[in-house]
Amino acid sequence: GPTGMTSTYFQVPQSDVGRLTTNYAVAKGVLLPLDPARSSIYLDKPAFPFGGAGLVSSPADYDRFLTMLLGYGVIDGRRVMSEAAVRMGTGNLLPAGVDTSKTMISGAGFGAGGRVGVGIDAGTYGWGGAAGTIAFVNYRVKNRASLFTQYMPDNTYPIHAEFPKAVIADLLAGRKVAA
């Protein structure tokens, strides 16, 4: 595709089954195989291919996607999305005053398929996956980051809230050391 993502699928080919990881359920602190890699549901053709429920990607490919977003639609010097589309999709599409307090985006806005930072977190866009994965771009500090895990439910550990904070803290600490 135009972003150079060569390991992203709706159905993982048999040739790549060895690269899949097992997804685990966490029950009372014990990891139990939920979707073993060798017989994963992602080896089957989906009933309907859509990214929010079944797009499988490698960390390298996902990073290319984040790089493209951070470049406002440009990757490797080539425009693959209009800047307007990226800004619209990574901007808050919710009307002012919408209460998100009892949702999975509590305290944030919502873009085209992702969480949008507001207030002190303005300039961030990203999303967490069902199996604990989290990825985001931070336009203010021109940074992208991702963390890949394979456990469910995704809220077993506080990674979704803590990972972005840890990344920013490390960036700020690095700037102090460099100064």
Regions found by a protein language model. Name each.
Residues 124-179:
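Structured C-terminal helix/loop/strand segments within mature extracytoplasmic catalytic/sensor domains
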